[in-house]
Every structure is written in structure tokens, then in C-alpha cells.
């Protein structure tokens, strides 16, 4: 469950390390984002010579949340940290690699490129 001012780790090699959510997309009154939702983020920490730099405003897909994800079969999955993958305006990942596991709920939200780059899908 991600809201405005939430800090997230970046799970790709775009050059950003930490980002902060500045808007949840999908309706004017929408307060929270979950796995697979698109948010607008500001890069707070970045590595030198990366594709993005500190202060850049970008879109991102939430790929991991510390809040439980409930599945239709009754099982629950949760992660240790909140993480996102930076995307461009065509909804393609900025980085070429994804780090860490991603849930299969991303498939239902049509983020197939992220699923294919991920080392593990839970």
C-alpha cells in the first residue's frame, strides 16, 4: 500500500536507488497504490553515470509492497520492502535488468516486460 511521500527502493538498473511517491495515478481521489499500479515518483538517490539522476520526475510500477497481497485461493504474500521499477511514457522499463522477485499479479496488469526480465516470479 503506497501513498504520497512513501519512499521505495528501485528494483532495476536504471541508476536510481531510492524514489519517493509524489502521486498515485488512476483517478483524482485515489489515495493508495498496490502491486502493479503506476505512480509518479521523484528520484531521491541515484548512482553516478546512471540513466536517471537525482531530482528526475518519472513514472514507476510498484512491484513489491510490505502490505499483504491477498490471492483468490486465500493465500497471502508479502515482501520485506516496498520496491518499484521505473518506466517511460510508453510503459516500458527504463532499466534492462530487474532485481529480486516480483509477484505474478503483474501479469494481470499487463506488465509483461517486467515479468520477462524478473529473475523470479512468485
From Swiss-Prot:
GO molecular-function terms, A-Z: large ribosomal subunit rRNA binding; structural constituent of ribosome
InterPro entries: Ribosomal_uL14 (IPR000218), Ribosomal_uL14_bac-type (IPR005745), Ribosomal_uL14_CS (IPR019972), Ribosomal_uL14_sf (IPR036853)
Gene3D superfamilies from the UniProt entry: Ribosomal protein L14
rRNA-binding recorded as keyword: yes
Keyword annotations of the record: Ribonucleoprotein, Ribosomal protein, RNA-binding, rRNA-binding
Listed PROSITE patterns: RIBOSOMAL_L14
GO biological process: translation
Cellular component, GO annotation: cytosolic large ribosomal subunit
UniProt-listed Pfam families: Ribosomal_L14
Record flagged with keyword Ribosomal protein: yes
Protein's job: Binds to 23S rRNA. Forms part of two intersubunit bridges in the 70S ribosome.
Family to which the UniProt record says this protein belongs: Belongs to the universal ribosomal protein uL14 family.
NCBIfam families per UniProt: rplN_bact
Assembly: Part of the 50S ribosomal subunit. Forms a cluster with proteins L3 and L19. In the 70S ribosome, L14 and L19 interact and together make contacts with the 16S rRNA in bridges B5 and B8.
Record-given protein name: Large ribosomal subunit protein uL14
